[in-house]
């Protein structure tokens, strides 16, 4: 999958291209990340990409022209990479909140162009003419769009075919089926008075699967009850829930 990231700080994306699952996927060309600096498309000796906002107010606003040229260049790179559909995504506090369903939709694309804002944001006309989607990673303010963009890229890349050494890993992640993940344990068996649940050491796969589901369901019910309402349970899972109800009686 091809990614073009429009950012004033391309060096930050070494965190994606050089480390972890996304780094390995990049080295194996499962994912390609190309960073484009809008300063390269700015005019004048100072290569300015920001100006004061019309109407007054604090801070600076990123100018439309250099960003538009950067996006056009990104689209050319996407076309050269063979992308049929590479939408332009702007990471913005005003966008829809990113979730697992949205990530899976992105995985189905063959390319993505991600715009990272800075300062007080970008000129609205740029958004109107060039941006296809706006996405947020939460209701809080960051210094720029680079960290949200890295969150987006990492969440997509780890879902790409062959990106993970164990294909079952992402299937068992939190939110994939609407539930949070279950508790995880490793060696040693005993740690500061706490023991690993015996069922996990039993080797009985059916019992382990049931235990993990019940843990996931109860954890989601306790911490994110609004998610439970959206979950579609299998016949077996509904049967397992009777054990959870019986344990409370």
From Swiss-Prot:
Record-listed S-adenosyl-L-methionine binding positions: 117, 137-142
Any one Gene Ontology MF annotation carried by this entry is:
tRNA (guanine(37)-N1)-methyltransferase activity
Q: Which UniProt keywords apply?
A: Cytoplasm, Methyltransferase, S-adenosyl-L-methionine, Transferase, tRNA processing
Question: Which domain of life does this protein belong to?
Answer: Bacteria
Enzyme class, spelled out: transferase
GO CC terms: cytosol
Give EC number(s), comma-separated: 2.1.1.228
GO BP annotations, alphabetical order: tRNA N1-guanine methylation
Q: Chief location of this protein?
A: cytoplasm
Name the chemical reaction catalysed here.
Answer: guanosine(37) in tRNA + S-adenosyl-L-methionine = N(1)-methylguanosine(37) in tRNA + S-adenosyl-L-homocysteine + H(+)
Name the Pfam families on file.
Answer: tRNA_m1G_MT (PF01746)
Localisation per UniProt entry: Cytoplasm
Would the keyword Transferase turn up in this protein's UniProt record? Answer: yes
Function according to Swiss-Prot or TrEMBL: Specifically methylates guanosine-37 in various tRNAs.
Subunit text: Homodimer.
Which family, according to UniProt?
Belongs to the RNA methyltransferase TrmD family.
Which PANTHER family does this entry report, sorted A to Z? TRNA (GUANINE-N(1)-)-METHYLTRANSFERASE
* Name of this chain's protein: tRNA (guanine-N(1)-)-methyltransferase
